[in-house]
Design a protein with these regions (language model features):
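Flavin (FAD/FMN)-binding glycine-rich loop and adjacent Rossmann-like elements that form
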Residues: 1-244
Length: 244
């Protein structure tokens, strides 16, 4: 859930620095499991000071089927109740910083990390990520960790400095379609690999690739995304600064 709190005490907050989950004495560790806050099902809390006395949060989770409008509506109602409990917990366990604070806003829409993905000519998998796999049709690099937010998710070691994998153009080209390409979080991956490739840097990489590819295709006499000249595409991407 995304929320903004205002009237946070600037001085007192400067003394604690943050309320991130990684802070061992942070308030979320007291809020989670407390019967007063039953909607808080995990310890996810990420905060960012965005203005004087204004703190933005990415905190908590709500399970939802994003293909079902009823489920989405229920999740948005439950999510705002969850936000209220997080606010009250922060007031209780960090009163010096948050005692006079108030909820200024919540996100207008439900944020969905994983929903529909499109089946392309190639599906990038967890095994590819673990192997730091290279591809002949690679159009960029990625080194982000496997960031899956379900509580029972397996945790995989992050890449070391300098390690990365290739992103194949073939996971951007939907099978059976000639005039549609995909970029960002809807590219063809399995669930765990999606946890790495859904974020902004690889989305920028795949977006740049399909943009350049589209420019090439539109000049063709018989446009077809599956007939892109990969070497020409890679050459142009290198020229504009993309790491291949």
């Amino acid at each position: 859930m995304l929320l903004i709190k205002q009237n946070v005490d600037p001085y007192e907050f400067s003394l604690i620095g943050n309320v991130h989950t990684n802070r061992k004495d942070g308030p979320i560790h007291s809020i989670y499991g407390n019967p007063k806050y039953p909607l808080v099902k995990d310890k996810h809390m990420n905060d960012k000071l965005i203005g004087p006395g204004i703190l933005g949060f990415n905190a908590g989770h709500v399970t939802v089927d994003s293909t079902d409008p009823v489920s989405l509506t229920e999740a948005m109602i439950k999510g705002r109740k969850l936000v209220r409990q997080l606010h009250e917990g922060l007031v209780e366990f960090e009163p010096k910083s948050f005692g006079a604070s108030f909820l200024a806003s919540t996100a207008n829409l439900m944020g969905i990390r994983e929903s529909r993905r499109i089946k392309c000519d190639y599906t990038f998998t967890l095994e590819d990520w673990l192997a730091r796999k290279e591809f002949e049709d690679s159009i960029g690099r990625n080194c982000y960790y496997i960031d899956v937010h379900k509580q029972d998710a397996t945790v995989y070691p992050r890449y070391k400095k300098g390690e990365s994998h290739g992103i194949p153009f073939s996971c951007l080209t939907p099978a059976g379609l000639k005039n549609v390409m995909v970029a960002g979080r809807c590219i063809s991956t399995d669930s765990y690999a999606h946890g790495s490739l859904r974020v902004m840097p690889p989305s920028l990489v795949t977006g740049e690739a399909v943009g350049v590819a589209a420019g090439q295709i539109c000049k063709s006499k018989s446009p077809d995304i599956h007939n892109v000249d990969i070497q020409k595409l890679r050459k142009r991407l290198k020229e504009v600064g993309q790491l291949i």
